Amino acid sequence: MGLKQVQLFVRGRVQGVFFRASTQREAKRLGLTGWVKNRSDGSVEVLAEGEEDELKELIAWANRGPSAARVERVDVRWRGFSGDFFDFRITD
């Protein structure tokens, strides 16, 4: 399917529930690179790159999140692969 990039905006009760750490763990399990961060509006933003099938798995996971999270909505934006990332990090 090819390499792609996806940007996610995850809304709901997603801060203070280990969402970023859980996202990092899931992304690494899937072999993805990129980052995850909290946003000032209470949402979490994810930018991930890798194979399209694995990115779709990450999107499905983000719609559930870790057990303490209550995901209300995930906005998805597909983008072109950049190759700018070498690991998956939690950032500011």
UniProtKB/Swiss-Prot annotation:
It catalyses: an acyl phosphate + H2O = a carboxylate + phosphate + H(+). Transmembrane segments: none annotated. It comes from the Bacteria. Its EC number is 3.6.1.7. It comes from Sorangium cellulosum (strain So ce56) (Polyangium cellulosum (strain So ce56)). Residues 5-92 form the Acylphosphatase-like domain. This is Acylphosphatase. Belongs to the acylphosphatase family. The gene is acyP. PANTHER family: ACYLPHOSPHATASE. The lineage of its organism: Bacteria, Pseudomonadati, Myxococcota, Polyangia, Polyangiales.
